[in-house]
Amino acid sequence: MIHFVLLVSRQGKVRLTKWYSPYTQKERSKVIRELSGVILNRGPKLCNFIEWRGYKVVYKRYASLYFCMCIDEADNELEVLEIIHHYVEILDRYFGSVCELDLIFNFHKAYYILDELLIAGELQESSKKTVARIISAQDQLVEVAKEEASSISNIIAQATK
């Protein structure tokens, strides 16, 4: 089971967090501070797996971001590396070569994509095409809702004149 997902920049700024196990806000802050310090200070040639507090942390650096997932000791690290890579590929497909700014300004989309991929700390959807289709449908729903809200606003504005 994946306990949490962290995306941290090389500067140590947290760009995305998703928690699948209960942690208090104080514990979350401590975990983020501790893990970002450990991961950012590791050399690029070192292993992408860390044993930490009875768990394993699997991380991978893509451009200026570190994608980290904390898993149970018995879980397969290589499978989690593939899940990270799968998430990055879906982000790349959606944003067209994803970068840190895409995640900053469109964080809600990054969370939505992650929610389509993982549920309760387990891989839900392995098909990139299915995830892309679902995200596209959600984008269309948002556009329709914006158009309806705009037309309702126009009707109200004309009625109050």
Curated annotation (Swiss-Prot):
Q: In which tissues is it expressed?
A: Expressed in seedlings, roots, stems, leaves, flowers and siliques (developing fruits and seeds).
Q: Which GO terms describe its biological process?
A: intracellular protein transport
Its placement in the membrane is given as:
Peripheral membrane protein
Q: Which PANTHER family match?
A: ADAPTOR COMPLEXES SMALL SUBUNIT FAMILY
- Self-association state and partner proteins as the record states: Adaptor protein complex 1 (AP-1) is a heterotetramer composed of two large adaptins (gamma-type subunit and beta-type subunit), a medium adaptin (mu-type subunit) and a small adaptin (sigma-type subunit).
Organism equals Arabidopsis thaliana
Gene Ontology CC: AP-1 adaptor complex
Which Pfam families does the record associate with it? Clat_adaptor_s
Does this entry carry the keyword Secreted?
no
Q: What does this protein do?
A: Subunit of clathrin-associated adaptor protein complex 1 that plays a role in protein sorting at the trans-Golgi network and early endosomes (TGN/EE). The AP complexes mediate the recruitment of clathrin to membranes and the recognition of sorting signals within the cytosolic tails of transmembrane cargo molecules.
Keyword terms = Cytoplasmic vesicle, Golgi apparatus, Membrane, Protein transport, Transport
* Recorded family membership: Belongs to the adaptor complexes small subunit family.
Q: Which CDD domains match?
A: AP1_sigma (cd14831)
GO: which molecular function terms? clathrin adaptor activity
Q: Where in the cell is it found?
A: Golgi apparatus; Cytoplasmic vesicle, Clathrin-coated vesicle membrane
**Gene name, please?**
AAP19-1
UniProt protein name: AP-1 complex subunit sigma-1
